[in-house]
């Protein structure tokens, strides 16, 4: 007989984190379900392996349908948040849709669930490839994960992991952009992804094309589980479980086997990547919680100099392609405090990208005289961000700010073989202090027929006089939604957005050692 599993979870008030007692929780499009107990917890037993959604509802709250998730070889714990409703009591119908409408983003938000990640044709369980299939996202080379949304470039996207900003989500990433051939984030960690292609929340700054907000699962509260996975390009495991009564964890490690496949089919380069990810969540009490998470990758691309097929094409590739070594990580912590209907959040994180390219003439490493390229670069970011939500009748105020310090270094040794051989010794060091403020006011009418969101964001840094005034990078935004009748809405949004150029541009020096783009009065 097929083994059955349980879906467990808790239903909480989105405003204050308090459990919602006696809420209805059912499996979407079925009559199978239950009611939460006095502390908001629920359990649905006898669930066969497969993909499901949950529907939760209670008097005085907006009905909610979760993103799709999978039951395979373990019980699932699923937290659900309900938002208070100001609408008069009446019969309601719940419609599941991948498009989630919010006051801040009534048009540009799409929620990506597990099934879409798993089943997307050619997606290979990689979120970037899933997004590439969406309208408004340009197609790129089959071996690249670059996101070009609404005509923008791959450097114009921002990524957040449970509120912690991460600089890139791909192995062998392009420095100064976000592309790469393979994703770093383990899809088994993901609960859902909010993909904003327009009308970004004011709390998510420094983006021109899109924002991807990843929401991760929590570890199992009751028992330990271990899962092994063999993917199209890697092998790995994921472990999760409790670490005491108030703490859960999950951790995964993956390593590629592409280097063996590439060697077998006779390709001139052998890429190897390893990534690790973890999340630890501790609930002090109903009012306070702390999540600590990390994401890291080690990438190494060697040259297959011992291959048998030394065709002219392969010789050409081996002659110009460098050895690539890249390391990247992000460590972050998110603390949340619930006070009445208000939520206070503090996020701290540190990220680093270490990038090395090395090339020897004829790939002969026996002598340093053969060294033609030695590129070494580091990007380090330290971030502190505060986000606060204050709720009033028919009105919500989101305010916060951020403070960041980043460093960028580049050491390049290169021999150029032209008419007269010459050596380039280039180095640059850049330190950058960044700060920003934001505020958003959200109004909902009594019957929720009309919603309005007015937000403003301002960012600045100490790079140059053109960038150090918050008012010069003032970013207002307005979103409106009006229900004409039934489920027919009239929606609209408008905004002005800014993005800081990449560190490779800001830190570029001329032959005299001056920051060239600072002298050119570069702005956001």
Regions found by a protein language model. Name each.
Residues 145, 208-210, 224, 230-237, ...:
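Hydrophobic, lipid-facing positions within transmembrane beta-strands of outer-membrane proteins
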Residues 111-113, 178, 267-272, 306-317, ...:
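Flexible, surface-exposed loop regions and adjacent strand-edge segments
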Residues 155-157, 189, 222-226, 245-249, ...:
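Outer-envelope beta-barrel architecture signal
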Residues 311-335, 377, 428-430, 489, ...:
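Outer-membrane beta-barrel signature, preferentially recognizing the C-terminal barrel domain
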Residues 1-91, 95:
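Periplasm-facing N-terminal accessory domains of Gram-negative outer-membrane beta-barrel systems
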Residues 281-299, 321-467:
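Face-selective signature of the C-terminal outer-membrane beta-barrel domain
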Residues 62, 68-70, 78, 95, ...:
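Periplasmic N-terminal accessory/gating domains of Gram-negative outer-membrane beta-barrel systems
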Residues 158, 192-203, 209-217, 224-268, ...:
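Predominantly transmembrane beta-strands of Gram-negative outer membrane beta-barrel pores used
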């Amino acid at each position: 007989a097929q083994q059955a599993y349980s879906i467990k979870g808790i239903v909480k008030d989105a405003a204050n984190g308090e459990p919602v007692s006696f809420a209805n929780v059912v499996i979407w499009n079925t009559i199978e379900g239950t009611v939460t107990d006095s502390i908001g917890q629920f359990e649905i037993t006898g669930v066969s392996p497969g993909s499901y959604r949950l529907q939760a509802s209670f008097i005085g709250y907006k009905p909610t349908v979760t993103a799709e998730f999978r039951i395979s070889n373990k019980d699932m714990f699923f937290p659900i948040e309900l938002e208070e409703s100001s609408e008069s009591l009446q019969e309601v119908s719940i419609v599941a849709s991948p498009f989630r409408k919010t006051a801040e983003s009534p048009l540009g938000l799409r929620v990506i669930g597990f099934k879409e990640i798993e089943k997307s044709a050619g997606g290979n369980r990689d979120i970037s490839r899933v997004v590439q299939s969406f309208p408004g996202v340009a197609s790129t080379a089959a071996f690249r994960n670059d996101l070009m949304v609404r005509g923008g470039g791959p450097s114009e996207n921002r990524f957040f992991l449970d509120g912690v900003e991460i600089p890139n989500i791909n192995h062998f990433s392009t420095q100064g952009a976000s592309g790469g051939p393979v994703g770093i984030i383990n899809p088994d960690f993901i609960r859902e992804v909010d993909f904003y292609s327009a009308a970004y929340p004011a709390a998510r700054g420094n983006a021109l094309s899109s924002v991807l907000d990843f929401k991760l699962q929590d570890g199992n509260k009751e028992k330990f589980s271990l899962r092994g996975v063999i993917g199209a390009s890697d092998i790995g495991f994921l472990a999760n479980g409790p670490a005491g009564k108030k703490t859960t964890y999950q951790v995964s490690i993956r390593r590629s086997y592409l280097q063996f496949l590439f060697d077998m089919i006779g390709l001139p380069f052998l890429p190897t990547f390893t990534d690790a990810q973890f999340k630890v969540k501790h609930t002090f009490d109903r009012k306070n919680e702390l999540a600590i998470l990390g994401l890291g990758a080690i990438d190494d691309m060697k040259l297959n100099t011992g291959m048998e097929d030394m065709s002219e094409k392969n010789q050409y590739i081996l002659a110009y392609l460098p050895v690539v070594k890249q390391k990247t990580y992000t460590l972050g912590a998110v603390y949340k405090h619930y006070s009445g209907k208000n939520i206070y959040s503090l996020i701290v994180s540190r990220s680093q990208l270490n990038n090395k390219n090395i090339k020897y003439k004829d790939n002969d490493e026996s002598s340093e005289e053969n060294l033609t390229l030695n590129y070494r670069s580091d990007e380090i970011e330290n971030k502190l961000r505060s986000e606060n939500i204050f709720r009033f009748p028919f009105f919500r105020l989101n305010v916060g700010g951020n403070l960041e310090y980043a460093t960028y270094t580049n050491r390049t040794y290169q021999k150029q073989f032209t008419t007269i051989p010459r050596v380039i010794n280039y180095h640059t060091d850049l330190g950058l202090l960044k700060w920003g403020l934001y505020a958003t006011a959200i109004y909902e009418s009594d019957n929720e027929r009309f919603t309005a969101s007015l937000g403003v964001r301002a960012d600045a840094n100490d790079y140059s006089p053109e960038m150090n005034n918050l008012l010069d990078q003032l970013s207002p935004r307005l979103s409106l939604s009006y229900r004409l009748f039934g489920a027919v809405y009239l929606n609209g949004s408008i905004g002005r957005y800014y993005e800081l150029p990449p560190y490779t541009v800001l830190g570029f020096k001329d032959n005299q050692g001056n920051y060239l783009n600072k002298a050119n009065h570069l702005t956001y």
